[in-house]
UniProtKB/Swiss-Prot annotation:
Residues 364-392 have a biased composition (Polar residues). Disulfide bonds join 179-251, 258-276. This is Neutral protease 2 homolog AFUB_070680. Secreted metalloproteinase that allows assimilation of proteinaceous substrates. Shows high activities on basic nuclear substrates such as histone and protamine. May be involved in virulence. Keywords: Cleavage on pair of basic residues, Disulfide bond, Hydrolase, Metal-binding, Metalloprotease, Protease, Secreted, Signal, Virulence, Zinc, Zymogen. Its cofactor is Zn(2+). Residues 1-19 form the signal peptide. Belongs to the peptidase M35 family. Its EC number is 3.4.24.39. Binds 1 zinc ion per subunit. The active site is at 301. It is an enzyme of class 3 (hydrolase). GO terms for molecular function: metal ion binding; metalloendopeptidase activity.
Length: 450
């Protein structure tokens, strides 16, 4: 039933390339074979501007993360490494890479360490997705990446000799002995919150706002809505089982792959979920649209686990701006799409950025967000009008002005003589810009205090 719902949904949408912004900077990945299953990736900044991005869950991450996808006879080979959820701000400098235009770096890794290639034979290797860009050690947007397609002929005997990155542990209990005392209390509360939030999100996916659903999944199709609802219901069910479900939960890191930037990670091949130290610093439930918390981190991780709902999701777009740029088929397969949608349903965040920078800080500052909310473009049109609150900026040091009564002010450039609602006239653009309008409303004084 689960597989049928998801399969029919995916078949209903195009399986083409990721939906990419037209002018976005990008990273080009060139894959080549070093020997047998050892691969070299050359990462190149193909844009015209310097970029700083998060290389965790990407090339140069020393953890056994999914850097490439492997296919045998058009069927993807199971990944046996880890899928991490990263913090969105306060990133350490060692998690970041900066590349000048045209600059490159290399990463070598062995694909047999995170996949069973012991039968040998032909294997196809490729990768694509979005990598988060960072400003002031905070995720501020995304850039796309894609690679060539590499065809390998794997020597089975040599592949067998490659040690697996993850060694099996004794998983006799569903919630392990690492979950005691305060950590057990924290986990149980987080699971209850995750169950409640995922259940509400499942209902919203089935029959809630079509605009909100489209913001994250780019479709109003009944099949797509049913597929999203089914996965979220499965997540809610798993979180409600308090250790009796399909996943094994660790309250501390038995494998040693947590660091100061990782909230939690999942081993999809064994349906294991691990909380990192950073998890315990998160709020139980955030009040910020698209913020991170313990509850949605569990939702994110449970979507990775195929034992909860098959197949498990990937990390194709991380953070609000990347997740909402994905095509329908890719959003269905993206963990953060579910976590962010659940957060948006819970907080009623339709069309809101909630502190997440919507433009990418580089070549596309003028992003138009779902729900018809247009962001300012940072250049020639400072006087954008936002829905509802109609926030303006004066072109100088105070871009986020909010006018009383949702009244729109002049845009600081070519139209100073705006006529406002209720026939109230703004300053006339001539010699007396500091007019005092009816009802004691003082206009802009033609300098720095809008």
């Amino acid at each position: 039933m689960k597989i049928t719902a998801l399969a029919s949904a995916i078949l209903a949408v195009a399986q083409g390339a990721l939906a990419l912004p037209a002018r976005a900077p990008a990273l080009d990945i060139t894959l080549s074979q070093v020997n047998n299953t050892r691969i070299k990736a050359v990462v190149k900044n193909s844009g015209t501007e310097k970029i700083t991005f998060v290389h965790l869950n990407f090339f140069n991450d020393p953890s056994p993360v999914k850097k490439v996808s492997l296919y045998r006879n058009a069927t993807e080979v199971e990944f046996t490494g880890i899928k991490q959820r990263l913090r969105s701000d306060g990133l350490s400098n060692d998690a970041l890479t900066t590349l000048a235009p045209g600059a490159t770096y290399e990463d070598e890794f062995d694909i047999a360490s995170t996949a069973n290639l012991t039968q040998g034979g032909p294997v196809t290797v490729r990768t694509q997705g979005f990598v988060p860009i960072a400003m002031n050690n905070k995720i501020a947007g995304y850039i796309p990446y894609s690679s060539n397609e590499l065809e390998l002929e794997v020597d089975a005997e040599k592949a067998v000799a490659v040690p697996a990155s993850i060694k099996p542990l004794d998983r006799r209990t569903k919630i392990t002995s690492s979950c005691t005392g305060n950590r057990a209390t924290v986990l149980n509360t987080a699971l209850r919150n995750a169950a409640s939030i995922a259940s509400k999100a499942a209902d919203a996916a089935s029959s809630g706002s079509s605009a909100l659903f489209t913001e994250y999944f780019k479709s109003t199709s009944g099949n797509i809505r049913s597929a999203v609802a089914a996965r979220l219901k499965a997540v809610a069910s798993e979180a409600s089982m308090n250790g009796g479900g399909s996943t094994t939960y660790y309250c501390s890191d038995p494998y040693g792959y947590c660091d100061s930037n990782v909230l939690a990670y999942t081993l999809p091949s064994t349906n294991e979920v691990v909380n990192c130290e950073l998890f315990y610093t998160l709020q139980e439930v955030t009040n910020d649209c698209h913020g991170q918390d313990q509850a949605t981190t569990i939702i994110h991780e449970f979507t990775h686990a195929p034992g909860v709902y098959p197949p498990g999701t990937e990390d194709l777009g991380y953070g609000y701006s990347a997740a909402t740029a994905l095509s329908t088929s890719n959003a269905l397969n993206n963990a953060d799409s579910y976590a962010l949608f659940a957060n948006a349903v819970y907080l009623n965040c339709q069309g809101q950025t909630g502190g997440q920078t919507t433009w990418d800080g580089y070549s596309q500052p003028g992003q138009t967000e779902p729900g018809t909310q247009t962001m300012w473009d940072g250049y020639s049109q400072p006087g954008q009008t936002e829905p509802g609150t109609q926030t303006m900026w004066d072109g100088y040091s105070q871009p986020g002005q909010t006018e009383p009564g949702t009244q729109t002010t002049w845009d600081g450039y070519s139209q100073p003589g705006q006529i406002e609602p209720c026939t109230q006239t703004m300053w006339d653009g001539g010699s007396e810009p500091g007019q005092t309008e009816p009802d004691a409303q003082t206009m802009w004084d033609n300098f720095y205090q809008a």
